[in-house]
Amino acid sequence: MATDGENGRHQEVGHKSLLQSDALYQYILETSVYPREPEPMKELREITAKHPWNLMTTSADEGQFLSMLIKLINAKNTMEIGVFTGYSLLATAMALPDDGKILAMDINRENYEIGLPVIEKAGLAHKIEFKEGPALPVLDQMIEDGKYHGSYDFIFVDADKDNYLNYHKRLIDLVKIGGLIGYDNTLWNGSVVAPPDAPLRKYVRYYRDFVLELNKALAADSRIEICQLPVGDGITLCRRIS
């Protein structure tokens, strides 16, 4: 029987993939993801890899998943909270029809501008409205205006984990019935099942409780159907049903 080491199993919490085998994850990337990755996304992925915070980016397999998902639900009006250099934003923009729209929000425009030339070169900038700054005040204003209720087909959240529940309380009103909200990092480096004495990085330990709280709240929310998947760092899809 092969040992854990022989199977390529990883033990450290905080791994690039939740799969237990590096070789298996690489197989997925090289067989099904990279060969079908559009050239603009490949270019942006390679640019982002040079960024000191490159771990913040959406993985290539998750980008592929988001693209497929958006096409399956025929999304047209979307929102993204947490943009970084824009890899997931680019995946969304490429999947939307030509008249599709994305409201994209991030506290750091500088990172967004790293990917913006790629987005512009791909002819997709017209689909994106970028707002710099905290998202919560924008969401509160949209709800107060009244005209945005139930207007979004798809919303992707990959931002400050300590505000995920605050986002959910607002986004549930903005997504349409039958629409989807995707929360990223809901398995949080695998730390959601780590023992109390696990050697977690400081930021992983800090945000873990917020992720656990979110997961519990989503599971109890009767307004949505949920599906949590081990794609990337874990993504939970919430389909609004009421």
From Swiss-Prot:
Protein function = Methylates caffeoyl-CoA to feruloyl-CoA and 5-hydroxyferuloyl-CoA to sinapoyl-CoA. Plays a role in the synthesis of feruloylated polysaccharides. Involved in the reinforcement of the plant cell wall. Also involved in the responding to wounding or pathogen challenge by the increased formation of cell wall-bound ferulic acid polymers.
Q: Which cysteines are joined by disulfide bonds?
A: none
The GO molecular function terms of this record are:
caffeoyl-CoA O-methyltransferase activity; metal ion binding; S-adenosylmethionine-dependent methyltransferase activity
Identify the residues that bind a divalent metal cation: D158, D184, N185
Q: Which cofactor does it need?
A: Mg(2+)
**GO biological process: any one?**
methylation
Residues the entry annotates as binding S-adenosyl-L-methionine:
T58, E80, G82, V83, S88, D106, A135, D160
The yes or no answer to whether the keyword Transmembrane helix is present is no
Short name of any one Pfam family annotated for the protein: Methyltransf_3
The top EC class is transferase
What this protein catalyses is: (E)-caffeoyl-CoA + S-adenosyl-L-methionine = (E)-feruloyl-CoA + S-adenosyl-L-homocysteine + H(+)
The cofactor remark states: Binds 1 Mg(2+) ion per subunit.
| Induction details | By wounding and viral infection.
InterPro entries per record:
Cation-dep_OMT, SAM-dependent_MTases_sf, SAM_O-MeTrfase
Pathway listed: Aromatic compound metabolism; phenylpropanoid biosynthesis
The positions annotated for binding substrate are: K16, D158, N189
Tissue expression profile of the protein: Mostly expressed in the bottom and middle parts of the stems.
Keyword line: Lignin biosynthesis, Magnesium, Metal-binding, Methyltransferase, S-adenosyl-L-methionine, Transferase
Family from the record: Belongs to the class I-like SAM-binding methyltransferase superfamily. Cation-dependent O-methyltransferase family. CCoAMT subfamily.
What taxonomic classification does the UniProt entry list for its organism? Answer: Eukaryota, Viridiplantae, Streptophyta, Embryophyta, Tracheophyta
The protein's name: Caffeoyl-CoA O-methyltransferase 4
Gene name of this polypeptide: CCOAOMT4
Q: What is its EC number?
A: 2.1.1.104
Identify the domain of life.
Answer: Eukaryota
